[in-house]
Curated annotation (Swiss-Prot):
Keyword line: Cytoplasm, Elongation factor, GTP-binding, Nucleotide-binding, Protein biosynthesis
Organismal lineage: Bacteria, Pseudomonadati, Pseudomonadota, Alphaproteobacteria, Hyphomicrobiales
Protein name: Elongation factor G
Species: Beijerinckia indica subsp. indica (strain ATCC 9039 / DSM 1715 / NCIMB 8712)
Family to which this protein belongs: Belongs to the TRAFAC class translation factor GTPase superfamily. Classic translation factor GTPase family. EF-G/EF-2 subfamily.
GO BP field: ribosome disassembly
GO molecular function, one term: GTP binding
Binding site for GTP: 17-24, 81-85, 135-138
Subcellular compartments: Cytoplasm
NCBIfam families assigned to the protein according to its UniProt record, in alphabetical order: EF-G (TIGR00484), PRK12740.1-5 (NF009381), small_GTP (TIGR00231)
SUPFAM superfamilies recorded: EF-G C-terminal domain-like (SSF54980), P-loop containing nucleoside triphosphate hydrolases (SSF52540), Ribosomal protein S5 domain 2-like (SSF54211), Translation proteins (SSF50447)
Function: Catalyzes the GTP-dependent ribosomal translocation step during translation elongation. During this step, the ribosome changes from the pre-translocational (PRE) to the post-translocational (POST) state as the newly formed A-site-bound peptidyl-tRNA and P-site-bound deacylated tRNA move to the P and E sites, respectively. Catalyzes the coordinated movement of the two tRNA molecules, the mRNA and conformational changes in the ribosome.
Xref: InterPro entries: EF-G-like_DII, EFG_II, EFG_III, EFG_III/V, EFG_IV, EFG_V, EFG_V-like, G_TR_CS
Gene coding for it: fusA
Family annotation (Pfam families): EF-G_D2, EFG_C, EFG_III, EFG_IV, GTP_EFTU
């Protein structure tokens, strides 16, 4: 069956914003006016169609990006709803990665807020073309022109108004469309579905002409012929002006700014028109790059149905009715349900079973998907976020998504045996859905450790465990992953002898222990010649070594980067055994760690703080107070970026501290960089706490 809409009619876009800017309400209205949602859901009463997880409805924040397909003026819109909280920036990055464009929603009262700055920078990183919708124009204190100024000063964008508001706060009635030079007014009683054109009010004519001139001047810069005509007194007509604005958006030359009030049902239809008129289609964007699996060389996949099939998985969710659902974007070719494909990232075969088009959390089964489609796949076994699925005969790995290392960990203990079983299943599903959430087991205590991007991130995971999976558990305090290291080369000669009547135990080992290169890991080798220690006992020596290295002598943390060499030993025909050599090796390793001068290591994080200039001094002083070493600073747009190396132990609670002294305008990212020796006074505190 041929595709129902040509790829030129596709708009894959996301709606990004600060928490509470009205992003979910805007999406709701888009779905309502484009006919996909029969009742308008309000975030205020926890019923918005897009916010479909309980945790989101309760907190009124959007956590997961739900993908929705709808239609407007014959065009197919695939909308990705992105979260607006700083602990979920991984979700935002993940959705920006597969978008062709974005609508940035601002609160008309607040302007560009801290999370807007973060998301804007992420959109810059992926070169996502965007338009801005200044929302909440009905709110007390709403100021459209201040928001436009904010785009210049806070995120370094070049805003160009294509609409102006008519009135504001309680008197907000409609908009002036500067492209058509008409006023558009909404009729209140029709839930915003009815609106009409009028002439521009007399008191706004002068302002409209001024901003129209700014728009035309910015647009004609993009075309020599249009510029020449304009200088000769001929303005571009509506069709050409739209074409030039579209070009500006595609090249991110300037950012068109629109306005309205989604909650009061004003301005949403012209926003949809702007999405269709100005945001790029899949073929307007650069072809996606990848690596040809067969040759190892870089290749590109064009957004065409005739190219070999390739798609990128960008989100995994556990659906209570369908099971595991993988959201993916088809970049090239076409795919039918029932087809076998290869997961080239993992080199595993997958079969495409059910394919679904998602509308928030309603779903429609489809048989084929084409280049440009965003679909949900049910029943994939091996695929994780960031994996490529492609044609078995033309394998390619598309650009990999990079996910930051988790920086905070907590211990979790199920309260009963039944909870223990449920916990294992639930955690494996949560880890598959979210690559920035990791699960591991503490070797010493046997505790399950959860690792994530921030305190809210882990709070929400624990909440999901309790609500969705009904797991009852105790939660520990956040911890740092320390390590221990041997400092000097030592030679140890150890004998283990035990005689208790009957068969005794006997083993002797002579071993050299020395520091290995940083990050080289632990290593064991045997240089035994002449059978001083028979071959069958050597695994016992290795096992004894590693059992001690898993829990060091200082404070019970894993020992890293040790090389141990077995050079000699002795055995007894009757009394020696694998166990005897294991016990002997354990004793030798403990002695070596004490005599060789073990030290504690701590994780050092590479911290990048982005802050408005006026808070630079406070940020630097605070980092130094956290035992940080500032590596340098530079300007990005109009913000200062400070790079520093800081021990993780001193970074707990940092996000709240940073928010408080920067009024929430500074933000930071951090990732693990290396391990470094803990200063003696700090090491004593750690040992007292853990030993």
């Amino acid at each position: 069956m041929p595709r129902s809409h040509p790829i030129e009619d596709y708009r894959n876009f996301g709606i990004m914003a600060h928490i509470d800017a009205g992003k979910t309400t805007t999406t709701e209205r888009i779905l309502y006016y484009s006919g996909k949602s029969h009742k308008i859901g309000e975030v205020h009463d926890g019923a918005a169609t897009m916010d479909w997880m309980e945790q989101e409805q309760e907190r009124g924040i959007t956590i997961t990006s739900a993908a929705t397909t709808t239609f407007w003026n014959g065009r197919r819109l695939n909308i990705i709803d992105t979260p607006g909280h700083v602990d979920f920036t991984i979700e935002v990055e993940r959705s920006l990665r597969v978008l062709d464009g974005a609508v940035c929603v601002l609160d008309g009262n607040q302007g560009v807020e801290p999370q807007t700055e973060t998301v804007w920078r992420q959109a810059d990183k992926y070169n996502v073309p965007r338009i801005v919708f200044v929302n909440k124009m009905d709110k007390i204190g709403a100021d459209f022109y201040r928001c436009v100024e904010d785009i210049k000063t806070k995120v370094g964008g070049r805003p160009v108004c294509i609409q102006l508001p008519i009135g504001s706060e309680a008197d907000f009635k409609g908009i002036i469309d500067l492209v058509r030079m008409k006023a558009v007014v909404w009729e209140d009683e029709a839930l915003g579905a009815k609106y009409h054109d009028e002439e521009i009010p007399d008191d706004l004519k002068e302002k409209a002409i001024h901003y129209r001139n700014l728009l035309v001047e910015a647009a004609v810069e993009l075309d020599d012929d249009a510029m020449t005509a304009y200088l000769e007194g001929v303005e571009p007509d509506e069709a050409l002006l739209k074409l030039l604005i579209r070009k500006a958006v595609r090249q991110i030359t300037f950012i068109p700014v629109l306005c309205g009030s989604a909650f009061k049902n004003k301005g949403v239809q012209p926003l949809l028109d702007a999405v269709v008129d100005y945001l790029p289609t899949p073929i307007d964007r650069e072809a996606i790059k990848g690596v040809d699996v067969n040759t190892g060389e870089e290749t590109v996949r064009l957004p065409s149905d005739s190219e070999p099939f390739s798609m990128l998985a960008f989100k995994i969710m556990d659906d209570p009715f369908v099971g595991s659902i993988t959201f993916a974007r088809v970049y090239s070719g076409k795919i039918e349900s029932g087809t076998s494909v290869v997961n080239s990232t993992k080199d595993k075969k997958e079969r495409i079973g059910r394919m679904l088009l998602m509308h928030a959390n309603n779903r429609e089964d489809i048989k084929e998907a084409y280049a440009g489609d965003i679909v949900a796949l049910a029943g994939l076994k091996e695929t994780r976020t960031g994996d490529t699925l492609c044609d078995v005969n033309k394998p390619v790995i598309l650009e990999r998504m990079e996910f930051p290392e988790p920086v905070i960990e907590i211990a979790i203990e199920p309260k009963s045996k039944a909870d223990q079983e449920k916990l294992g299943i639930a955690l494996s599903k949560l880890a598959a859905e979210d690559p920035s959430f990791r699960v591991s087991t503490d070797q010493e205590s046997g505790q399950t450790i959860l690792k994530g991007m921030g305190e809210l991130h882990l709070d929400i995971k624990v909440d999901i465990l309790k609500r969705t999976y009904k797991v009852d558990a105790n939660i520990g305090a956040p911890q740092v992953a320390y390590r221990e290291k041997l400092m000097r080369r030592v030679e140890i000669d150890e004998t283990h002898k035990k005689q208790t009547g009957g068969t005794g135990q006997f083993a002797r080992v002579k071993m050299i222990f020395e520091p290995n290169e940083a990050a080289a890991g632990n290593a064991f080798e045997s240089n035994i010649v002449g059978g001083a220690v028979p071959k069958e006992y050597i695994p016992g020596v290795e096992k004894g070594l590693y059992s001690v290295l898993n829990s060091g002598v200082l404070a019970g943390f894993p020992v890293v980067d040790v090389k141990a060499t077995l050079i000699d030993g002795a055995f007894h025909e009757v009394d020696s055994s694998v166990l005897a050599f294991e016990i002997c090796s354990r004793a030798a390793t403990r002695r070596a760690l004490k005599e060789g001068g073990s030290v504690l290591l701590e994780p050092i994080m590479k911290v990048e703080v982005t802050t408005p200039e006026e808070y630079t001094g406070s940020v630097m002083g605070d980092l130094l107070g956290r035992r940080g070493q500032v590596q340098g600073q530079d300007m990005r747009g109009n913000a200062v970026v400070i790079n520093a190396m800081v021990p993780l132990a001193n970074m707990f609670g940092y996000v709240n501290q940073l928010r408080s002294f920067s009024q929430g305008r500074a933000n930071y990212s951090m990732q693990f960089d290396h391990y470094e020796q803990v200063p003696a006074n700090e090491a004593a505190k750690v040992q007292a706490k853990y030993a």
